[in-house]
């Protein structure tokens, strides 16, 4: 995976699945030691950008934002845009923050630079889309797979919604900086990738039972990204250079696949719906946010056991029962996934995240309504299996939260 852009173009360009594949608009990806220092100024100069708004929060400003401004001193004028935290201490991609960021970007800026992790990138990609100018990605932690995608999960009127905006024109990932990321941020990135276990199964189920568009090549690329993380989990856990490089490559590859498809289907299923629901509830109650990848990882660990427990369930629909067996019997069990996540230093249950059991039950009942997607999460509600899962009625076995 030395040249991710060419690899994705070649693999998906040869695909004959019949679904729409969009052009890959990311021009450059640089992952390596001193990638920002050595390659960002040259890229800005070659593109003839004159005025860059560098967007960051208090923490990422110290880590990268101010350094970027210094690096570009002789190349372009830079304007800092500091994102403020809310009362709970989080920077969130809600209306207030989005408008504040847009106001902070000078009208004559011709490029934006996102210096941060997932939320900052979502805010910047929205601003770039609204202003009609490109943005450059400078990740400060290997924590999410959305760096190179066009989808921006935003909080609009208190509800989590993914808005298709724009992908970065380029990404520069400094391995020295990424290796210094806190362990919980690294574990969050691994958790976001672990979510592909259930999201890929959900995509296949939706193909079989709901006739949703499906691309085998995109599924295969996402699976490769997941497998690469699993193969290097010990190196990732130790934050070794090669391990962090492979984690970052995997996150970027997943994002590029989403970009070409113009949707997040291979990377986001029931586990993301649960995560988004819990995030919305935290905002409602003015609570500090839990890292996205931590919630996704815990959701995937729980859902894989739920999905496996559906095998053999009597649904009164032979086709659905056969599809469930063919897809879900290939899933690893939650105990094995928890071992992987624990090795990286991440949480394996919602109890560890201080999420109340009753809220998890509520999420299992309602999170599938957030997106019009067919998932195993929707199946358990469609066929009335949730009470049995929660030990409150007949049906499949209970599940550990």
From Swiss-Prot:
Homodimer. The keyword tRNA-binding does not apply. Pfam families: Fe-ADH_2 (PF13685). One of its GO terms (cellular component) is cytoplasm. Substrate binds at residues 145, 192, 276. Binds 1 nickel ion per subunit. Its EC number is 1.1.1.261. It catalyses: sn-glycerol 1-phosphate + NAD(+) = dihydroxyacetone phosphate + NADH + H(+); sn-glycerol 1-phosphate + NADP(+) = dihydroxyacetone phosphate + NADPH + H(+). One of its GO terms (molecular function) is glycerol-1-phosphate dehydrogenase (NADP+) activity. NAD(+) binds at residues 57, 118-122, 140-143, 149. Keywords: Cytoplasm, Lipid biosynthesis, Lipid metabolism, Metal-binding, NAD, NADP, Nickel, Oxidoreductase, Phospholipid biosynthesis, Phospholipid metabolism. It is an enzyme of class 1 (oxidoreductase). It is found in: Cytoplasm. Catalyzes the NAD(P)H-dependent reduction of dihydroxyacetonephosphate (DHAP or glycerone phosphate) to glycerol 1-phosphate (G1P). The G1P thus generated is probably used for the synthesis of phosphoglycerolipids in Gram-positive bacterial species. Ni(2+) binds at residues 192, 272, 292. Belongs to the glycerol-1-phosphate dehydrogenase family. Its cofactor is Ni(2+). PANTHER family: GLYCEROL DEHYDROGENASE (PTHR43616), GLYCEROL DEHYDROGENASE 1 (PTHR43616:SF5). This is Glycerol-1-phosphate dehydrogenase [NAD(P)+]. GO terms for biological process: glycerophospholipid metabolic process; phospholipid biosynthetic process.
